[in-house]
Amino acid sequence: MEGISLAKLLIVGALIVLLFGTKKLRSLGGDLGSAIKGFKKAMNDDSDATSKTASEDKNAGQAVHKE
């Protein structure tokens, strides 16, 4: 049991290209890239909103202590 060699990966890659064609694979790659970009954007938006809320809560707490 050697595992997966480079030759085996090339054969599998060639079979995938033959089955789906280059246009379909290019389209699939673009869709996958868009999905990853959207996921990263959503994660950044969520963390920005969380940090903004935390800083607002901290400022609100400081205002209460001043009174």
UniProtKB/Swiss-Prot annotation:
GO cellular component, one term: TAT protein transport complex
Keywords (A to Z) from UniProt: Cell inner membrane, Cell membrane, Membrane, Protein transport, Translocation, Transmembrane, Transmembrane helix, Transport
InterPro entries the record matches: TatA/B/E, TatA/E, TatE
Places the protein is found: Cell inner membrane
UniProt keyword 4Fe-4S present: no
Principal subcellular localisation of the protein: membrane
Topology of this chain in the membrane: Single-pass membrane protein
One Gene Ontology biological process: protein transport by the Tat complex
UniProt KW Repressor keyword: no
Sample GO molecular function, one term: protein transmembrane transporter activity
Transmembrane segments: 1-21
Biased composition (Basic and acidic residues): 54-67
Disordered: annotated span: 43-67
Family (UniProt): Belongs to the TatA/E family. TatE subfamily.
Function: Part of the twin-arginine translocation (Tat) system that transports large folded proteins containing a characteristic twin-arginine motif in their signal peptide across membranes. TatE shares overlapping functions with TatA.
Entry protein name: Probable Sec-independent protein translocase protein TatE
Biological classification of the source: Bacteria, Pseudomonadati, Pseudomonadota, Gammaproteobacteria, Enterobacterales
